């Protein structure tokens, strides 16, 4: 079904059963939309959690008198997100599964169901906004800096952004919680906020990787200093990350991880090397505003999606055939392959990439 034939008053809302999607449903209904809730049943280490979430979402839908559906996407989620997560770590990278899930699994699933249901709009409870500039939609930071989730949605395409609604983008988490209490949703208002990787169920990611892939999937190798001198052995790159000092198994506890050399399957350590960098190059990136020739594009750069990590001012430059040169005005600490890096002009997301 093409978007031109979809009802402008119907919206497909992703519902997890938690506070944010519950209040998004309420706000959309109060705004006059005909809301259809969809719970995506993703793969989880503890399958019962997903059943509980679906039941909570259904209960909310019944309370609001809106339609509710469940879509089972466990197989595709396992392949594209969980297996990717494990594979990247085993290669010595630091992946962000949310940045993988949103453009590849979650939003395409919402879009598919929206088309099937005749919904012009798709919505979620993310704390972000959007803005139309020069006939192009851009993602924008949420009004509450402490809950802004734009870092995790930087790679949504134009079709999705054009149809997306973000009812919570202008609100703070505290205000949403207050409104939930005032509107009879005490259960979700006091519900503990979920943190971390959704499918780990609180398990350490290293234990999870072994659990999913077995010890035989790990490649033991050498721990070396920056000159290549062998200092010890490791049981797999997945057990290490840049800056790590504990758990190296070396007699001298002054060493820390400088980088993970996946091509040689080595953990490189040092006692004195700096983990700060002023420049990186990206081959896997997207920009809505491309610098031309020698022109530098001034941006604010976010490396991690945690609200306590501020953006760093910097510049972008296209270097052919290498890709995108990212220069930081102030050195950034501990950048590792696999991380997402997002670029902003003021509060507007203009692109991003994978280190």
Give the positions of each predicted feature.
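ATP-dependent adenylation/nucleotidyltransferase module used to activate substrates
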Residues: 1-154, 173-175, 257
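AMP-forming adenylation/ATP pyrophosphatase catalytic core
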Residues: 123-129, 138-355
């Amino acid at each position: 079904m093409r978007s031109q034939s979809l009802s402008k008053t119907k919206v497909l809302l992703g519902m997890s059963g938690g506070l944010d999607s519950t209040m998004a449903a309420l706000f959309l209904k109060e705004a006059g939309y005909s809301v259809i809730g969809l719970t995506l049943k993703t793969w989880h280490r503890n399958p019962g959690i997903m059943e509980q979430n679906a039941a909570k979402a259904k209960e909310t839908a019944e309370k609001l008198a809106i339609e509710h559906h469940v879509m089972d996407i466990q197989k595709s989620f396992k392949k594209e997100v969980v297996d990717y997560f494990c594979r990247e770590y085993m290669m010595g990278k630091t992946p962000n599964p949310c940045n993988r899930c949103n453009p590849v699994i979650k939003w395409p699933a919402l879009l598919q169901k929206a088309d099937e249901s005749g919904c012009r709009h798709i919505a979620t409870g993310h704390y972000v906004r959007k803005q139309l500039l020069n006939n192009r939609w851009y993602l924008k930071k949420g009004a509450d800096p402490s809950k802004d989730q734009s870092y995790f949605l930087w790679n949504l395409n134009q079709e999705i952004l054009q149809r997306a609604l973000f009812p919570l983008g202008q609100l703070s988490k505290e205000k949403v919680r207050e409104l939930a209490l005032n509107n009879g949703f005490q259960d979700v208002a006091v519900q503990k906020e979920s943190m971390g990787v959704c499918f780990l169920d609180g398990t350490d990611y290293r234990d999870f990787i072994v659990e999913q892939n077995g010890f035989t999937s790990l490649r033991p190798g050498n721990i070396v200093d920056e000159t290549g001198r062998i200092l010890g052995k490791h049981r797999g790159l997945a057990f290490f990350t840049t800056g790590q000092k504990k758990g190296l198994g070396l007699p001298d506890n002054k060493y820390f991880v400088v980088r993970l050399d996946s091509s040689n399957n080595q953990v490189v350590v040092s006692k004195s090397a700096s983990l700060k960098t002023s420049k990186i190059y990206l081959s896997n990136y997207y920009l809505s505003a491309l610098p031309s020739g020698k022109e530098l594009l001034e941006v604010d750069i976010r490396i991690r999606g945690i609200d306590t990590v501020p953006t760093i001012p910097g510049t972008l430059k296209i270097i052919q055939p290498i890709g995108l040169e990212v220069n930081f005005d102030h050195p950034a600490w501990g950048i590792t392959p696999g991380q997402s890096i997002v670029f902003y002009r003021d509060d507007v997301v203009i692109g991003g990439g994978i280190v």
